[in-house]
């Protein structure tokens, strides 16, 4: 990838990611509290819906930038003229992008979610408590579950987004506009969000679990089994509506803004 393309992907991805995370933060807080083992009301209800936003503000730009730089680089490296291989290339690029991005995302996500369900505590207090009680390892609690959530999500979202853009482009006989890319992103994101909600619930429970508990060990299958045993199908899909709404809107803003900013920089 040329230096100009690299910079364009970095800036476009970072700007798009920060915009989405900050605009939709209240919906993310509501979703997290619905998924909390304490329940929605005890986790804060509708109070302090911006609790944990400093963690997001710090982590969202480098997280999204890392994903898109890796994603675009991998697409270029793995590029093929065969249309049949395109979905596989997009999946592989998304997989690599998530592995890199999660190294930045997880510490930010851990502190953010703990602050979201403890609105009386500040982000700095949550960071201090986590480091004091669990060390650096505590910041990466749920790394495996986050990767196991994000990779299936991206394997659905990004190939579907690229497919819808290509289909729309073929139908109208020209490249899609940025708003059309955004619409494709909304559909792709909403669908991917719905089918991966159980993994998102498991990830939230692992990150919020008390140190030393069975769920806190990071075993996703154990967490899913516990949720199913205690709450059934409703527990596995807790927060699915705000998650779908948030990610559909996020897909519209994020992928539309990414294409717009990147094209304007190239």
UniProtKB/Swiss-Prot annotation:
Transmembrane segments: 5-25, 49-69, 84-104, 141-161, 181-201, 237-257
GO cellular component: mitochondrial inner membrane
Key word DNA-binding present: no
Keyword terms, alphabetized: Antiport, Membrane, Mitochondrion, Mitochondrion inner membrane, Repeat, S-adenosyl-L-methionine, Transmembrane, Transmembrane helix, Transport
Annotated Gene3D superfamilies: Mitochondrial carrier domain
Record's bilayer topology term: Multi-pass membrane protein
Spans of repeat Solcar: 4-77, 85-167, 176-264
Family: Belongs to the mitochondrial carrier (TC 2.A.29) family.
Protein's name according to its UniProt entry: Mitochondrial S-adenosylmethionine carrier protein
Protein's gene: slc25a26
